[in-house]
Amino acid sequence: MYLITLPSFVKITKDWCAITKYTFLVNPQSSSGSGEKVWNKIEPELKRRRVAYRVLFTTPECGATETVRRFTADKRRHTLIVLGGDGTINEVVNGIADVSKITLGYIPTGSGNDFTRALNLPTKPLAALENVLNPGRLVPLDIGCAKLDSVPRKFAVSSGIGFDASVCHFVEKSSFKAFLNRIHLGNLIYTGVALKRLFLDSRVDAEVILDDGEPRHFSNVYFAACMNHPYEGGGFFFCPEAKTDDGMLDVLVAADIPLPKVFLILPTAFFGKHTGFSGVHIFRCRKVEIRAKEPLAMHTDGEPAAVGTVLKTEICKEQILLMVP
């Protein structure tokens, strides 16, 4: 059963599980091997319930983007269940040939899980599987399109330039990431790297152009985040008003803030209370162009993407259907 006409939501019939064939895309190495452990819990339940499915495993030689690109090349309708972290979701949306033909389910295994927060998706493996087999509804989900110094990328949660992307770049290089993920303390590496980058990274001047309007000038910019979801960075509630289906981007610019004040503001961002501080600017737009005076790190969904001076983002034309409780 595939439902493509999109009102505000699509109700699911009781026969959903019985008449749907699922394709599971499994990243075994997600969160330092947690993906494989989660799949080992999921597969016996699928067999016990006699669910029709097939499974595709990512490998170092063929990651999620290439695996999904090959799988969706036929441009037929598919029910695709992603088992991985926010990074796997990012790879998947960059590999789908035609998002309008995909019904997406998600079983999270990562440490950040920003994708699940705004959508209230289950995080426990068997609860997430139940949502996939018996979803309450299908909701349309926006996908972001970014150009990072002319390099095109898509994103599900957010794209950014500056401090937040710098943290992503250095976390990816850290030798401690795998160890902390194994002991379920993966977020600690982000905290440690973030504190270090606050002291070491330089702030730059930048222009922000909203919807082809006049440039807005900002001095001493820490970072700019283009948000499709309200959360990024492992739970920072950066854009509390962001909606995942409104065709709009919420843009946060943090600029000209004394460093001691940054340490005061950052903890409040977990609760969305940072928005009242001077130096924190939030805008809503359909597209945005950010021009930095010097090269800065850039990311999509927390994945290091490029180092450059120009980041352009907008919401893609087509939405993807997502299974939610």
Predicted segments — roles?
Residues P28, L83-G85, T109:
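Glycine-rich beta-strand-to-loop/alpha-helix junction loops that act as flexible
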Residues G160, D164, F223-F238:
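Glycine-rich phosphate/pyrophosphate-binding beta-alpha loops
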Residues T88-V99:
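Short Gly/Thr/Asp-enriched flexible loops that form oxyanion-binding sites at enzyme active sites
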Residues R49, L56, D98-G105, G110-N220:
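Catalytic core of DAGKc-family lipid kinases
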Residues D164-V167, R216-F218, Y231-G235, L259-V262:
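Short acidic/glycine-rich loop or secondary-structure boundary segments that cap or lie
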Residues M1-L80, N90, A127-L129:
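ATP/NTP phosphate-donor binding region
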Residues G35, L210-D212, F237-P325:
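ATP/nucleoside-binding phosphotransfer catalytic cores, i.e., glycine-rich phosphate-binding loops
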